[in-house]
């Protein structure tokens, strides 16, 4: 859809654009010479100086020619490149000329939206950058204050303090020392309580081991006593037996004499 309109300027368009400067090209000078249309050659290389045409007639002729060429270029651009093109031109007399391959109003709304999005994006980025810069400045100031406070607490930055400030610092230090001592005592009490519990546990273990040792000693004594009783009984039994004939006799009685035993011994001696 290609639209070309030529009409008087209306306030309803809502778009005010500066009058485009005419573009001169070699050989396009209207009815007059190059000087009549505001294009003058400079030097030997054929450069053209663009300036306002003072003659009203020549200016109007040049406007009509250039306007037609501009509209033709806009049409070719929209067709060849499938681009959305909207062209709005106001003459020096206020006459409106426009061209659009879709709709001038829709193209203008699209332009406004794109321009607004770009502005908003840049605005958000700028706001974020400012916010981060402010936060960084606050953090730097906090770091500086903490460093000064630490130097003051260790007594390195008190030369410029008056009596009141020194008194306040002393109170803060006393309060801090009180908290430190309380925490230290708390840790010491906890350590002492732990050591006492550990001592009780070790005493219980020691008593248990002592009872085990005593029980083992009693068992060993019982075994030794049982072994000694068995040995004594065995010895007592051996005392009541004659080792020569294993005949039991009383130790209080004298052994009887047997002549046959002497004869047997003598006979055995003679044979040897």
UniProtKB/Swiss-Prot annotation:
SUPFAM superfamilies: SRF-like (SSF55455)
Record domain K-box: where: 129-219
Transcription is among the record's keywords: yes
Residue spans of biased composition, Gly residues class: 27-36
Keyword tags: Activator, Developmental protein, Differentiation, DNA-binding, Flowering, Nucleus, Transcription, Transcription regulation
InterPro entries with a match to the protein in the record: MADS-box/MEF2_TF, MEF2-like_N, TF_Kbox, TF_MADSbox, TF_MADSbox_sf
Chief location: nucleus
Gene3D superfamilies: Transcription factor, MADS-box (3.40.1810.10)
One Gene Ontology term from the biological process aspect of the record: carpel development
Residue span of region Disordered: 1-41
Phenotype reported upon loss of the gene: Abnormal flowers with floral-like organs.
Residue ranges of domain MADS-box in the record: 43-103
Pfam families: K-box, SRF-TF
Sample GO molecular function, one term: DNA-binding transcription factor activity, RNA polymerase II-specific
Gene Ontology cellular-component terms listed: nucleus
CDD domains found in the cross-reference section: MADS_MEF2_like
Task performed by this protein: Probable transcription factor involved in the development of floral organs. Acts as a C-class protein in association with MADS3. Involved in the control of lodicule number (whorl 2), stamen specification (whorl 3), floral meristem determinacy and regulation of the carpel morphogenesis (whorl 4). Plays a more predominant role in floral meristem determinacy than MADS3.
Protein name according to UniProt: MADS-box transcription factor 58
Originating species: Oryza sativa subsp. japonica
């Amino acid at each position: 859809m290609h639209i070309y309109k030529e009409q008087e300027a209306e306030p309803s368009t809502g778009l005010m654009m500066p009058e485009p400067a005419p573009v001169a090209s070699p050989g396009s000078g209207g009815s007059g010479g190059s000087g009549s249309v505001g294009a003058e050659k400079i030097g030997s290389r054929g450069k053209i100086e663009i300036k306002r045409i003072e003659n009203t007639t020549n200016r109007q002729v040049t406007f009509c020619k250039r306007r037609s060429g501009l509209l033709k270029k806009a049409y070719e651009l929209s067709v060849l490149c499938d681009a959305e093109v909207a062209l709005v031109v106001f003459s020096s007399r206020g006459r409106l000329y426009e061209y659009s391959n879709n709709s001038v109003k829709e193209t203008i709304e699209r332009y406004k939206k794109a321009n607004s999005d770009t502005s908003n994006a840049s605005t958000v980025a700028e706001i974020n950058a400012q916010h981060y810069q402010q936060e960084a400045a606050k953090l730097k100031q906090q770091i500086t204050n903490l460093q000064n406070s630490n130097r003051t607490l260790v007594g390195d930055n008190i030369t410029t303090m008056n009596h009141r400030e020194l008194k306040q610092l002393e109170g803060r230090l006393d309060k801090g020392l009180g908290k430190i001592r309380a925490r230290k005592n708390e840790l010491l009490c906890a350590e002492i309580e732990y050591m006492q519990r550990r001592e009780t546990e070790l005493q219980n273990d020691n008593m248990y081991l002592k009872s085990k040792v005593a029980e083992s000693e009693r068992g060993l004594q019982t075994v030794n006593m049982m072994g000694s009783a068995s040995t004594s009984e065995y010895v007592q039994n051996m005392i009541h037996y004659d080792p020569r004939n294993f005949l039991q006799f009383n130790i209080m009685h004298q052994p009887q004499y047997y002549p046959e035993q002497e004869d047997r011994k003598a006979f055995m001696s003679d044979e040897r």
